[in-house]
Amino acid sequence: MVHYSDFTVDSRIQRQARALAERGDRVDCICLSDDAEFDVGTGTIALHRAASGKPRGGARAYLEGNARFLAGAARKVSALDRRERFDLVEIHNMPDVLVFAALRPKLRGVPLVLNFHDTFPELFATLFDRTARHPLVRLIRAEERLSAALADGLVFVTDEARDLLRERGIAGKQTQVVMNTPDERVFGERRPAAEPPRSGELRVVYHGGLADRFGVETLVRAVAQLRAQGEPVALDVYGSDAEAARQLAALAAEVAPSGVRIAPQPTPVEQIPERLAAADLGVVPTMRDDFTELLLPVKLLEYVHLGLPVVASRLPVIERYFGDDVLLAEPGDAASVAAAIEGVRADPVAARARAERASQRLAGIEWRQQRQGYLGLVDGLVAAKRAG
């Protein structure tokens, strides 16, 4: 596997690597994590660092960071392939062009899977305020098509992402939707829905990315509004972006000095259930743009799995999968988020009923089902290679 991320906090990578290793496979992950090797089930996961980290800055620094990781990953893949003789290589975007890191095994006939975590053109346009017609965005669309054409199999996170890429002419010989649902081996079985407290402090939690598009500033302001009205609401925020955490902490000190705690630290996947154990409510305040309209946030699925009521932004994919079984708020509107949180406090019985219905919806897409589809794709490609 090749992925431009830290293995310890990337839940999608971990789930899929563990699914393979548990049944006896060896999985080499070329990533941003320190070199390490450990047994999982009857197999092994080995981590290989290909770059020191992601640079901060504008579009140029972002693309240069991608290029450096691609070069380092290509060297690692080639060296490991000489020794291990890979049966399959899986590339996790972004960027899509990481498929070229697997050029050596691809040339000797090894099947290549491109796993679309996100749609890169939409994300790049959102990050750097570019239009769809900007030359760089058009170039990224071209590399997306070329990268997909090199792959033997394509993996998508939702039906919506698959359908969008099909509209752009991207289709593989074999495709599979593998959703980001929590791994029962890490999170345990789905927990019974919890009823928020009728009195006393309501503990709200957010964990994950702290970039502007995740809307955490809106959530901080919403909690500040509630506290100004005398509502005993507290917010815990967990995120690994130190600079964004510093800015959010400064905002919290200004608008809600005693009610918001910003924890600027990564949350390893296996620690998420413990971190969220004291929470009464999970909030997913994602902003609306072309990129986020395609998202079904992992954190939302984790809150539902753990039995928490959820307040989430009114976004198309969230509405499709959960309807009114999560309380919906308008993206970027602190008053709307505050009203939704207040609604949980006002009627905890209804909040628990919604959480229970959301949990039942999750039952239809949980990881044990996604795992079967993922392993089926991998095994089919490897079998076809060996037969041909």
Predicted regions and their residues:
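Conserved acidic donor-binding segment of nucleotide-sugar-dependent glycosyltransferases
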Residues: V326-A334, G343-P348
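Membrane-proximal helix-turn-helix segments that form the acceptor-binding/catalytic region
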Residues: R104-L107, F120, H134-L154
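Acidic anion/phosphate-binding donor-loop and adjacent secondary structure
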Residues: R166, T181-G200, G215
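A short, well-ordered alpha-helix in the C-terminal region of glycosyltransferases
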Residues: G343, A350-G364
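Carbohydrate-associated surface elements
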Residues: S33, E160, T181
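Conserved donor-binding/catalytic core segment of Leloir-type glycosyltransferases
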Residues: P196-V223, D236
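Nucleotide-sugar-dependent
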Residues: D10-S11, F214, P266-R275, G282-V304, ...
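Nucleotide-activated donor-binding/catalytic signature segment of Leloir-type glycosyltransferases, i.e.
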Residues: E201, R246-L276
